[in-house]
C-alpha cells in the first residue's frame, strides 16, 4: 500500500512538473481566467517563465505582466504562476494557481481605478494579500484585505475618504466587506465565477433630512440603513 501511495505521489509530481513547460497561453485557458474578464493581446513562453502582453481584467488595464512558476508549490500538488506587473500604476504582484483544491488566487496585490455607479462615485481600490480557493465554481476560502479610496462624498452624504475591510467567501462568491472610518457607511462587493459582481452600499442616515436625500438618489430603506445595490460585469 505504501508503495502504491508513493507511486501516486511521484506520478502526480511528475505530471505537475511537466505542466510547468506547457505554453503559458494554455495554462491561462485551463485556469478559465477568461470567465472573470481576463484578456490579453498575446503571450510568450511557458508556465515556467513567460510574459503576458496588454492584459486587462474587465475594464481594468493591467499592462504587460512577467510570469514564472513557483517550484515549491509543485511539491504541494499545485502549479502556481506568480505575476509581476510592469505598470507601476497597478502595483500588480502575486499569482494564480491550479491543482489540489481547485483554482486559486495567491497573495495578490493590485491597485485599480473603479468607475462610479449612480450615487456611488468612482474611486481607487487597493487589494492587499488576497488569497482564495475556488473548488469548482464557488469560493471556498479567502483572506486578505481591501481598501477603497473615494475622493468625493458617497451619495453626497458620507465625507470623502477610505473604506477598508477583509476579503471573505460569502454564499459562494468572493466578497470584500468594506466600512468607513466613522461606521456610517458600508460597501459589500461580491464577485462571482463568471466575471459578474454586485455592489451594495449601505448608509446610516443621521436624520430624516439625510434619509429623504438618500431616497431621492435611489437608496431604499433596510434594517441596517439605506441601501443602493447594482450588478455589473468586471
Q: Model-flagged regions — what are they?
A:
Residues 24-42:
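Alpha-helical transmembrane signal-anchor/signal-peptide segments
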Residues 62-72, 125-127, 137-174, 212-233:
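Beta-propeller and related beta-repeat scaffolds in trafficking/envelope systems
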Residues 84-88, 147-153, 179-182, 203-207:
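Short, solvent-exposed aromatic-acidic interface loops
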Residues 121-124, 134-141, 194-197:
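Charged, low-complexity intrinsically disordered regions
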Amino acid at each position: 500500500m505504501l508503495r502504491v501511495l508513493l507511486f501516486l505521489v511521484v506520478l502526480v509530481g511528475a505530471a505537475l512538473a511537466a505542466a510547468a513547460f506547457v505554453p503559458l497561453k494554455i495554462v491561462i485557458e485551463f485556469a478559465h481566467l477568461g470567465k472573470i474578464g481576463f484578456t490579453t493581446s498575446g503571450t510568450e513562453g511557458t508556465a515556467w517563465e513567460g510574459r503576458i502582453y496588454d492584459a486587462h481584467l474587465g475594464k481594468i488595464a493591467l499592462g504587460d505582466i512577467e510570469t514564472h512558476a513557483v517550484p515549491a508549490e509543485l511539491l504541494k500538488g499545485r502549479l502556481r504562476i506568480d505575476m509581476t506587473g510592469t505598470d507601476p500604476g497597478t502595483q500588480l504582484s502575486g499569482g494564480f494557481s491550479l491543482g489540489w483544491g481547485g483554482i486559486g488566487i495567491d497573495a495578490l496585490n493590485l491597485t485599480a481605478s473603479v468607475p462610479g455607479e449612480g450615487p456611488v462615485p468612482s474611486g481607487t481600490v487597493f487589494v492587499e494579500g488576497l488569497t482564495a480557493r475556488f473548488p469548482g465554481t464557488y469560493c471556498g476560502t479567502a483572506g486578505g484585505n481591501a481598501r477603497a479610496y473615494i475622493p468625493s462624498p458617497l451619495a453626497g452624504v458620507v465625507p470623502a475618504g477610505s473604506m477598508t475591510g477583509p476579503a471573505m467567501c460569502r454564499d459562494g462568491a468572493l466578497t470584500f466587506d468594506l466600512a468607513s472610518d466613522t461606521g456610517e457607511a458600508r460597501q459589500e462587493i461580491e464577485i462571482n465565477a463568471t466575471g459578474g459582481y454586485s455592489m451594495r452600499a449601505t448608509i446610516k442616515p443621521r436624520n430624516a433630512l439625510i434619509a429623504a436625500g438618500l431616497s431621492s438618489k435611489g437608496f431604499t430603506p433596510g434594517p441596517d440603513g439605506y441601501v443602493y445595490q447594482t450588478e455589473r460585469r468586471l
